[in-house]
């Protein structure tokens, strides 16, 4: 396997891992309390778990596009919340 192939495989795993870790963070910390979470808070939490900022932001965007998250803009900042579908997914496991 070449170095380029290894890099591509690592990137592919990274983005799937970012989404999985995002759902874990949401399930552990947002689901029980409800409410909204700032983008920066989620990016920082995912960063502590080894997810790069770009991957964390991509995971947020893609998860929202799937209808699992809602967003509310406050000036230049965004807060995220679980949609009814996201809430249901995390509660049912």
Predicted regions and their residues:
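Short acidic, hydrophobic short linear motifs in intrinsically disordered regions
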Residues: 33-45
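Short, amphipathic alpha-helical interaction segments positioned at domain boundaries
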Residues: 87-93
